[in-house]
């Protein structure tokens, strides 16, 4: 049975949610600057939420020529600690460790993956290790962790790949419904830093438009914060 203190907390929490929602008009369109300001003022959670973007495109990712996928280096980073695993031959392990890799090795990492122990956010591999990694492709692939040369995670330049992963590189990939979703920093970032990240991400995804696509590309865009409000962006305000 709830006591008076529990009831008071629930009422207080509900009031904060209502007040937050009142600060955002559900039927309004915002430019990026106003959207960031509104989301900050409407946030009520006690942790540092992530600024999230959802973009709806007029594509059908089931067709290979309409797949939209790539990576973006966010100027202000993501605000998250990224654990990087590097799968390489023994002679390059020290280089990977010196560059900041959290996990380094070859068959030892493969064995951990097979055992269900995936303690990393990004997996980087040298080209000569791809045959070995193929044995865990069905495990890493669905999790978005399979090294890919198009994403810069299959490379001879281990140092730069680790630097990019650690400094705020974000991968994007269109889902079945033509939707791309990504986290672009913490709401505690300055407005300027969040806008830098937003502009860099939006520019990269728009440039990734499939060459043979007919009709409009970007259909809708929304910004939100973790457990917070969502606002729709006025596409005419996107340069």
Curated annotation (Swiss-Prot):
Organism superkingdom: Bacteria
Single GO term (MF): structural constituent of ribosome
Keyword vocabulary terms for this entry: Repressor, Ribonucleoprotein, Ribosomal protein, RNA-binding, rRNA-binding, Translation regulation, tRNA-binding
Tagged with keyword Zinc: no
GO annotation terms (biological process): regulation of translation; translation
Keyword RNA-binding: yes
GO CC aspect terms: large ribosomal subunit
Pfam family, any one: Ribosomal_L1
Quaternary organization: Part of the 50S ribosomal subunit.
HAMAP family linked to this entry: Ribosomal_uL1_B (MF_01318_B)
Purpose: Binds directly to 23S rRNA. The L1 stalk is quite mobile in the ribosome, and is involved in E site tRNA release. Protein L1 is also a translational repressor protein, it controls the translation of the L11 operon by binding to its mRNA.
Membership in a protein family: Belongs to the universal ribosomal protein uL1 family.
Listed name of the protein: Large ribosomal subunit protein uL1
